[in-house]
């Protein structure tokens, strides 16, 4: 009995630290990018996946202690995919006491009608979904649209654009929507996916599978995701360092002449951004920048977590 109590206490201790870390990361991202302001009505896009559940959960938690007043409304888009469990999200949100709206639009039927069998449907589906969510935000009077992308998503997008698009372009934590009417925010921008996975397991969210439409996963993104996960295991701190690099950009030391005016550099110019070592190697720190060992006692022993996804029959 004492041993069981000790295990439960340790689990609760680790969960509390995990929740605190997620709260801190979300709070810091909100502050750094001024994501949420006094009086904001934040439309939280809820898909039924681990990321959006966690985002809503943490925002609710922060709302209680925030120095500003803001409201939340969860929005789910029921795209009429076969087998979509329509009762799951309303039941969960009613239990949480969250204001919400379920938007029913048969985008699945539109996509199936336009895209031939066997072809990827994600691009068209995404455009349709985006337009509906923008319209819904206007109808609800939402001042911000919150999406559940996390740090790993941002890094994956950076490498996708580098490897396949020839661009140094990631996924911004805050942006103006492509229709020019809405501000989109990503409160989980500083959060690690593995933290979100552990949190979702502990909270026992009713996870809805993401492939009800039958579409194949993005193979390019999966390759990048696997690469980053391998690096995270083999080279602790590399992911944190790369993310830090995205926040410490030095345009004068890149090659984009549209971003920095190299042509104006003359013998009369001042040293720019510390100059360059030119002939010498730059001394780098022994430990990766931005990395600290995880503080959970059983990190090394902890097995990979597995989310219990609802079985749709």
From Swiss-Prot:
Pfam families: ATP_bind_3. Homodimer. GO terms for molecular function: 4 iron, 4 sulfur cluster binding; ATP binding; magnesium ion binding; sulfurtransferase activity; tRNA binding. GO terms for biological process: tRNA thio-modification. This is tRNA-cytidine(32) 2-sulfurtransferase. It is found in: Cytoplasm. SUPFAM superfamilies: Adenine nucleotide alpha hydrolases-like. Catalyzes the ATP-dependent 2-thiolation of cytidine in position 32 of tRNA, to form 2-thiocytidine (s(2)C32). The sulfur atoms are provided by the cysteine/cysteine desulfurase (IscS) system. Keywords: 4Fe-4S, ATP-binding, Cytoplasm, Iron, Iron-sulfur, Magnesium, Metal-binding, Nucleotide-binding, RNA-binding, Transferase, tRNA processing, tRNA-binding. The keyword Transmembrane does not apply. The keyword Nucleotidyltransferase does not apply. The thiolation reaction likely consists of two steps: a first activation step by ATP to form an adenylated intermediate of the target base of tRNA, and a second nucleophilic substitution step of the sulfur (S) atom supplied by the hydrosulfide attached to the Fe-S cluster. Belongs to the TtcA family. It catalyses: cytidine(32) in tRNA + S-sulfanyl-L-cysteinyl-[cysteine desulfurase] + AH2 + ATP = 2-thiocytidine(32) in tRNA + L-cysteinyl-[cysteine desulfurase] + A + AMP + diphosphate + H(+).
